[in-house]
């Protein structure tokens, strides 16, 4: 974490004026040409864009490329890369930027903006008592951001984080227990979701809100859906907590269709660093996308049990896969788009390994399937959370008897249907019709083709394509699908799939509180608090 070192020159300057008249000091502190009150509507929009950039306001691809793609997508075997350091999740190697990116950018950009909104709409702030819906929407954004930090690292600074301007005692915030953070975040979601109301004054909220355009009903649904996610994350370690908050989420009202999906719209400009989709930009061939392919694990799953026919194929096969194609900065050139011929790259292999497997010198671009380029346009929207996840979590809750949820089969089938039919946000041609979903469900009957919880876990895994942050967390908690770890000689985990990120070296060296509260041992195979699988 970057600390407020810039405060120290200001403090030293203050010592030079200790003998001055207090009124003179007051006048000196006012710059008539400065903006002393920030526009909270602008800050809120910036915070929402920051959610899509995972905290990085200066380079929207930075965190996605290093962590969402480089670690998460490869560790859960959605993607594969025969190279080295740009994809540490493939061979379980170390990349310091991968570790640092979510931590540093979430605190320094994302949470900083949210903290300003909460401070200025609280007692003593310049907008105290106003912008109630924006304030509570910011509490939901804050819960989303901290949930991810806890899920990635374990214990993190929470209760006193982002308070450096309140005094020097907050310059090095202490670490808080993951379970305590989760409990407080669930409380925050409960209070914030309940407090939002369409009857409250708009006060610029609708214009500032680029996710739901001020639709309070959708904000409430997202708040309760996020509550459901977090409650189920805690279900293996705190059954009472999970039961309480699953009940609250259902009673409050979760997402009920793909129209409720939390999506940040993106655009080609004015800034490629802020307005464009960071995932798409990270995959551009010049930025590292060229040697990245769909994993054999994912392609084999999408092709069903019988690879000789398309009868039991997942209807998302040729939605997620754009085929075997040569992709350069100049053009996307399809080579083979036949579903039967789609082929994923095995994880944990380098070029020599691939040559040995194929029995010939491998031209990767002409051998392995790529992500559909229609999902990687610079102005494609950025999915934050979707309705499919909600239905699949309700299916799991019903299957396990948590929170009064019922009818697991109906929730499961609704979740699969929603997952198959949500890709039209990228291109209208990617929507799967009902007949294809019906055929897939008939070929894979709930609780019959495989054990029910395994089917739920596998569907959560595949439904989070592109949202690999959450797919990694779902896999760590549920344990499905059963993934075979890689064991490349360069790996650092002894052939174990990483289960957390290490803290940034800047935090280890720069925050004295790290030594007495962080999750230890600080390595890739330590489990976060809810991970029992």
Predicted regions, residues:
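Membrane-proximal, proline-rich intrinsically disordered regions
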Residues: 20-72, 108, 116, 122-125, ...
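Structured, solvent-exposed acidic/aromatic patches
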Residues: 34-41, 80-141, 145-423, 427, ...
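Glycan-recognition patch characteristic of GH18 chitinases/ENGases
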Residues: 54-57, 62, 73-79, 83-86, ...
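Amphipathic alpha-helical surface "interface" segments used
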Residues: 71-72, 137, 204-218, 338-348, ...
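C-terminal functional modules
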Residues: 420-533
């Amino acid at each position: 974490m970057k600390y407020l070192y810039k405060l120290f020159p200001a403090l030293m300057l203050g010592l030079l004026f200790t003998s001055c008249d207090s009124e003179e000091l007051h006048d000196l502190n006012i710059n008539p040409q400065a903006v002393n009150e920030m526009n909270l509507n602008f800050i809120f929009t910036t915070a929402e864009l920051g959610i899509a950039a995972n905290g990085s306001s200066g380079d929207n691809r930075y965190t996605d490329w290093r962590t969402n793609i480089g670690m998460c997508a490869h560790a859960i075997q959605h993607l594969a890369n025969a190279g080295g350091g740009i994809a540490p999740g493939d061979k379980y190697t170390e990349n310091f930027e991968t570790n640092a990116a979510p931590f540093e950018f979430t605190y320094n950009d994302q949470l900083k903006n949210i903290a300003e909104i909460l401070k200025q709409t609280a007692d003593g702030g310049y907008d105290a008592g106003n912008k109630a819906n924006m304030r509570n929407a910011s509490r939901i954004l804050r819960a989303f951001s901290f949930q991810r930090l806890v899920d990635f690292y374990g214990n993190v600074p929470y209760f006193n984080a982002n308070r450096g301007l309140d005094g020097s005692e907050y310059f090095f915030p202490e670490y808080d227990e993951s379970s305590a953070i989760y409990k407080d975040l669930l409380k925050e979601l409960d209070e914030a979701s309940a407090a939002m109301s369409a009857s409250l004054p708009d006060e610029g909220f609708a214009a500032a809100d680029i996710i739901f355009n001020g639709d309070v009903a959708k904000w409430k649904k997202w708040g309760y859906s996020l509550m459901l996610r977090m409650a189920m994350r805690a279900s293996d370690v705190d059954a009472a907590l999970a039961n309480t908050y699953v009940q609250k989420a259902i009673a409050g009202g979760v997402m009920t269709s793909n129209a409720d999906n939390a999506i940040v719209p993106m655009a080609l400009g004015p800034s490629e660093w802020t307005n464009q989709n960071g995932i798409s930009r990270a995959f551009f061939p010049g930025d590292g996308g060229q040697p990245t392919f769909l994993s054999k694990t994912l392609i084999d799953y999408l092709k069903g049990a019988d690879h000789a026919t398309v009868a039991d194929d997942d209807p998302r096969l040729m939605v997620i896969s754009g085929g075997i194609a040569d992709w350069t900065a100049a053009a996307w050139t399809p080579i083979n788009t036949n579903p039967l011929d789609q082929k994923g790259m095995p994880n944990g292999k380098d070029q020599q390994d691939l040559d040995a497997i194929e029995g010939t010198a491998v031209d990767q671009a002409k051998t392995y399937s790529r992500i559909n380029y229609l999902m990687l346009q610079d102005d494609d929207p950025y999915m934050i959370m979707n309705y499919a996840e909600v239905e699949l979590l309700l299916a799991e809750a019903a299957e396990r008897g948590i929170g009064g949820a019922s009818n697991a089969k109906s929730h499961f089938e609704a979740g699969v249907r929603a997952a198959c039919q949500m890709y039209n946000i990228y291109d209208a041609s990617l929507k799967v019709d009902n007949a294809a979903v019906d055929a897939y469900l008939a070929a894979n009957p709930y609780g019959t083709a495989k054990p029910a919880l395994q089917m739920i876990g596998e569907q959560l895994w595949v439904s989070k394509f592109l949202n690999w942050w959450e797919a990694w967390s779902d896999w760590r908690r549920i344990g499905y699908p059963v993934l075979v770890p890689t064991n490349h000689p360069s790996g650092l985990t002894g052939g174990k799939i990483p289960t957390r990120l290490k803290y940034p070296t800047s935090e280890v060296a720069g925050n004295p509180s790290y030594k007495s509260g962080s999750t230890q041992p600080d390595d890739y195979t330590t489990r976060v608090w809810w991970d029992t699988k």
